[in-house]
Structure formats: C-alpha cells, structure tokens
C-alpha cells in the first residue's frame, strides 16, 4: 500500500532525525559572555556535559580495568576582584577507590586532566601500573625482593632458547680457537706472501708485523757483524796514536823521528835503523 510505505518512510526519517539530534550538543539558552568568569563557567558546564555523554554512550576503553571511576569536576573557584580567570579542579572520588580498589599491578588508562574527554592535550591512552606488586615477571637471575639484589641459581634453558645459546657458544669457541692458532698458521704460510698479506690486512696487524720483522732483521745484522776493536759508538770516536814508523808520525814530529832513526853505511846505501 502506498500510504503505509509513506508512513514507514516518514517514521524512519523521524527516527534518523532524532538520532542526528542526539549526536549534536545544542545550547538551550543563549549566554552573553561578560567576562573571563562567565567563560570559565561555560567551559566547566560543557566539560560536564561532554563527560556525561561520553560515559553514557561510549563503552569503556579496552585497556581500562575495573578501577576508579572518571574524575569529577568540582565547582569552579570564584574569580577575585582583580578579574583573574577562575580555574577548575579535577579530583577523583576517594570513596569509590576505597570501596573497590584496583588490584595491585593492574593496568589502567590515564587520559590526562580532562578525564575521559580526549583532546589534543591527551590524545593517547597511556598505560599506568597501580602501586603494589609488579605486573611484570620477576627476573630469573634475582631472588627475593628487588631491593635486596640476591642472586639465585640460574634455571636451565629449554626449547629454541637453549638451541640458540648452544649455537652462539659453539661459534664463539670456534672463533677463539681460530684466533689462538693464528700465529702457527702465520709461520707456516710464510711461503705464500699473498696469502700472508691478506691475513695481515684482514686482521689489522700489518703494521705490527712490519715493525716486528724490521726489529728482528736489525738484530740479525748486529749478530752477524764481527767484534772489531776500533768500532765504537758514533758519538765518541776512538783516536789511536800513530805508530813510530808510519809516515803520519814523521809528518807530525820530524825531529823526533830523525833522532830515533840510526843510519848505517854499507855498500854506499843508507838503511834506516830499527
């Protein structure tokens, strides 16, 4: 029937209009703003309305535990004579907390100073652990209260943790063995200079190896040199006196040399004496 369809459509439109009206906040009377005190009172009223609407329509947060109710807005403080704006105070009710306290270690949501009204100042749900026993598991290495710091016997690992630990231990043991046997392989691989150079570059001991070889070569050269009496330190050279029969002594002291020499005549030849 066309009449019934029209009535049903009108009823559906009215229901949708009522739902739309419920989703908006309408002011029943106009307010004339005369000063900062009126503005603060209007803000407090809007906050109360939004808080009640949010608590009535929206379900509780998934991370919220059955704990204290949302904080209630106290009456606004009256402005003083100088005209400074009044501030609103937020305080959770103590009777609800004492009657139904949250269990120790429970996680609850902290939405900031505006209670459950989520704005730019508190847009996220911050998890807070209530005082009491910690919700986290106790560390296996500590025994007793956290403040004592007593060590307990470590429990053996099981499953994939044990396999990963054994794999890491075996890898570290192989690495230590490789580092310990590195000097032996170095002495055996002296015949291959390219491989030795590659190992030194990868290990970062190229400069140390060069200094060690230079020092050992210098020691070998000092060991091969013969012990000469005239060799001495460069800072204090040794000057030996010239021998009496050397031409250097004759040039330095010709009178003494001629006095020491004795001439012998024989076969018309001059022979210097000894």
UniProtKB/Swiss-Prot annotation:
Keywords: Cytoplasm, Phosphoprotein, Proto-oncogene, Wnt signaling pathway. The modification Phosphoserine is found at residues 243, 246. GO terms for cellular component: cytoplasm; nucleus. Phosphorylated. Coiled coil: none annotated. Residues 191-214 are annotated as: Involved in GSK-3 binding. It holds the Pfam family GSK-3_bind. Highly expressed in testis. Lower level of expression in spleen, thymus and brain. The keyword Signal does not apply. Residues 7-23 have a biased composition (Acidic residues). Residues 1-24, 55-107, 132-194, 232-274 are annotated as: Disordered. GO terms for biological process: canonical Wnt signaling pathway; embryonic axis specification; protein export from nucleus; regulation of protein export from nucleus. The keyword Cytoplasm applies. It is found in: Cytoplasm. Binds DVL1. Binds GSK-3 and prevent GSK-3-dependent phosphorylation. Belongs to the GSK-3-binding protein family. It is linked to Activation contributes to progression of mouse T-cell lymphomas. Positively regulates the Wnt signaling pathway by stabilizing beta-catenin through the association with GSK-3. May play a role in tumor progression and collaborate with PIM1 and MYC in lymphomagenesis. This is Proto-oncogene FRAT1. The gene is Frat1.
């Amino acid at each position: 029937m066309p009449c019934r369809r029209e009535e049903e459509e009108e009823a559906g439109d009215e229901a949708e209009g009522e739902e739309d009206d419920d989703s908006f906040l309408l002011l029943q009377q106009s307010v004339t703003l005369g000063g900062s005190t009126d503005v603060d009172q209007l803000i407090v009223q809007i906050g109360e309305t939004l808080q009640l609407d949010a608590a009535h329509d929206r379900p509780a947060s998934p991370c919220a535990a059955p704990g204290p109710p949302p904080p209630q807005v106290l009456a606004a403080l009256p402005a003083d004579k100088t005209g400074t704006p009044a501030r609103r105070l937020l305080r959770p009710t103590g009777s609800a907390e004492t009657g139904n306290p949250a269990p120790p270690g429970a996680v609850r949501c902290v939405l900031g100073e505006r209670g459950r009204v989520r704005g730019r100042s508190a847009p996220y749900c911050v998890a807070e652990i209530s005082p009491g026993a910690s919700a986290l598991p106790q560390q296996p290495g500590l025994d007793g209260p956290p403040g004592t710091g007593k060590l307990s016997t470590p429990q053996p690992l099981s499953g994939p943790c044990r396999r990963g630990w054994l794999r890491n231990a075996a890898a570290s043991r192989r690495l230590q063995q490789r580092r310990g046997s590195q000097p032996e392989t170095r002495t055996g691989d002296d015949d291959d200079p390219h491989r030795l150079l590659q190992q030194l570059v990868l290990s970062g001991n190229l400069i140390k190896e060069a200094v060690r070889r230079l020092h050992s070569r210098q020691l070998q050269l000092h060991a091969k040199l013969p012990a000469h009496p005239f060799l001495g330190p460069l800072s204090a050279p040794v000057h030996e006196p010239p021998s009496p029969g050397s031409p250097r002594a004759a040039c330095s002291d010709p009178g003494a040399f001629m006095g020491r020499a004795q001439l012998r005549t024989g076969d018309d030849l001059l022979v210097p004496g000894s």
